[in-house]
Amino acid sequence: MGLVLGIKAALIASVSCWAGGLWLSPDLDTRSNALRWWGALGFLWWPYRLLVPHRSLWSHGPLLGTTARLAVLLTWCLIVTMAVPALSPAVLLTTLQQLMRQHPREFIALLVGLEGSAWIHLILDGDPWPQEWSKKRQR
């Protein structure tokens, strides 16, 4: 990462991989250490836990799992901006777009680190594919 995008991006990827492993694990759909790390904010993952079956494509799928967890966080951020009069969902989304445009390398590094933490989790689980894919490969 450092050779391609620079040292700053490598540090961002490293920190996001660490944070992703602690707070954005594919196991947020179960009672897990990752869920406990959220403490009192663990309730934020209730809809995800309710809607996403464990080891499904949406929890453990390459790219899709990380995207789903980031979508849950973005949805909660948008809900907060709607609930707080001083904030605005449009401002949040515009700010996010500006950050992506102004700092594309850092944004890519952030996403690579988060996805990397998910892959590390999947490999440590012993089978890096969601259950749906594993069943198809066994046939």
Segment roles from a protein language model:
Residues 1-139:
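N-terminal membrane-targeting hydrophobic helices
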